[in-house]
């Protein structure tokens, strides 16, 4: 009996969470409330923000209606530019960096140390506890 009551309460809670009033109020123009609709500008959340999404990319959508799409572009003559020659910079030799991070493991007969690659500053990880079942 307790199990049946717990199942009923769990299902009631799940139905209450899924049937909240917030999704009902957040349905704007047929789509749900998105992150950009909450925090972004209104243009981003608007479903009509990109009216040219169904046209090819070659269509000029800067002006709507397309009045000046076929306007002739002015001719531009390029003047010769001076040649740029790159100067050779002195080569810089980078010395290898010794990593000082060390892992130390102590067993019954020996102490093992191993460098920890990738540590820039001094890091020590010491495992001095005996392995399980060795005492």
Curated annotation (Swiss-Prot):
GO terms for biological process: adult chitin-based cuticle development. Residues 1-19 form the signal peptide. Pfam families: Cuticle_4. Keywords: Cuticle, Repeat, Signal. It comes from the Eukaryota. Transmembrane segments: none annotated. Detected in the epidermis underlying the head and thorax (including legs and wings), but not in the abdominal epidermis of newly eclosed flies. Sequence repeats lie at residues 72-75, 78-81, 128-131. The keyword Repeat applies. GO terms for molecular function: structural constituent of adult chitin-based cuticle. The keyword Repeat applies. Component of the cuticle of the adult fruit fly. Could be involved in thickening of the hard adult cuticle. The tetrapeptide (A-A-P-[AV]) repeats found throughout the protein are also present in many proteins constituting the protective envelope of other species. This is Adult cuticle protein 1. It comes from Drosophila melanogaster.
């Amino acid at each position: 009996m307790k199990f049946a009551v717990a199942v009923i309460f769990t299902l009631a809670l799940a139905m209450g969470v899924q049937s909240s009033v917030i999704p009902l109020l957040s349905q704007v123009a047929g789509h749900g409330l998105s992150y950009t609709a909450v925090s972004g500008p209104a243009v981003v959340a608007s479903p009509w923000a990109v009216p040219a999404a169904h046209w090819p990319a070659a269509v000029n959508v800067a002006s709507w209606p397309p009045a000046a799409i076929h306007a002739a572009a002015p001719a531009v003559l390029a003047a010769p530019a001076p040649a740029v020659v790159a100067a050779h910079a002195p080569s810089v030799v980078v010395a290898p960096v010794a990593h000082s991070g060390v892992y130390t493991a102590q067993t019954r007969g020996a102490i093992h140390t191993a460098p920890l690659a990738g540590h820039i500053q001094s890091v020590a990880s010491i495992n001095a506890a005996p392995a399980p079942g060795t005492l």
